[in-house]
From Swiss-Prot:
GO terms for cellular component: tRNA methyltransferase complex. S-adenosyl-L-methionine binds at residues 54, 79, 106, 129. Pfam families: Methyltransf_4. Keywords: Methyltransferase, S-adenosyl-L-methionine, Transferase, tRNA processing. The lineage of its organism: Bacteria, Pseudomonadati, Chlamydiota, Chlamydiia, Chlamydiales. It comes from Chlamydia caviae (strain ATCC VR-813 / DSM 19441 / 03DC25 / GPIC). It is an enzyme of class 2 (transferase). This is tRNA (guanine-N(7)-)-methyltransferase.
Length: 224
């Protein structure tokens, strides 16, 4: 399958949430989420295996590799850019990865409207846009509302991982995580090598430019 074989299943004027070809489409500037009847994830995957989720999936190298290496785990790749979703979808088909599903849409919207409580074993946020300028802070993924949803959708002892090349973004994200989750890494709560992390296109890109990569990992506290 080539990336261009995947087509958006609606015209913009008639946009709505849809599932087609193992992709959940959540359109931008769309607010009728409650009108969509979301199937259970057991139905969507065809099994009741535990579920992990990658946010900011890019071209899909990392999540496809993870799904291949962990066939006992179901994976959700969340990416808002359709050109990148096409590449993930192409890899999923060409490598016959049956335990991967794709969400084409904003991570915040997906978490808020399409995930039930305590559904995810692991959330990995790979190199989110840091939006470094102060006037753009509202666009950052790590906000109070997002963290509330992270805690809600993680199972007990579920894990949240962030990988980033932006030290300032890392520090701010850690402050937010510490308010509701427990760090698994000692103070200063991040490391430069994370065991079993895997390999991603963005990681290779930033390392090739001489950038340091930082990882942090938090676990859901008992009773949250």
């Amino acid at each position: 399958m080539k990336p261009q074989n995947l087509k958006v299943p609606f015209f913009w004027e008639e946009r709505s949430t849809e599932i087609k070809d193992n992709v959940l489409y959540i359109p931008n500037h769309y607010f009728k989420h409650d009108q969509f009847i979301m199937p259970s994830w057991e139905e969507f995957f065809g099994n009741n295996n535990p579920i992990s989720c990658e946010l900011c999936s890019g071209n899909g190298d990392w999540v496809v590799s993870q799904a291949q290496n962990m066939p006992q785990m179901n994976w959700i790749a969340v990416e808002k850019r359709f050109d990148r979703v096409r590449k993930i979808w192409s890899k999923m088909h060409n490598f016959q990865v049956s335990n991967l599903r794709i969400v084409c849409g904003e991570a915040q919207t997906f978490f808020r409207h399409y995930l039930k409580n305590e559904i995810l074993q692991r959330i990995v946020v790979n190199f989110p846009d840091p939006w470094p300028k102060s006037r753009h802070r509202k666009h950052r993924l790590f906000q109070d509302e997002f963290m509330n949803d992270v805690v809600r959708v993680l199972v007990e002892s579920g894990i949240l991982v962030l990988a980033t090349d932006d030290k300032n973004y890392l520090v701010e994200a850690i402050k937010m995580m510490r308010q509701c989750l427990l760090p698994t890494i000692e103070d200063p709560y991040y490391c430069k090598v994370l065991d079993n992390y895997g390999d991603s296109w963005f990681e290779r890109l930033w390392r090739s430019k001489g950038q340091e990569i930082f990882y942090t990992e938090f676990v859901k506290k008992v009773g949250i």
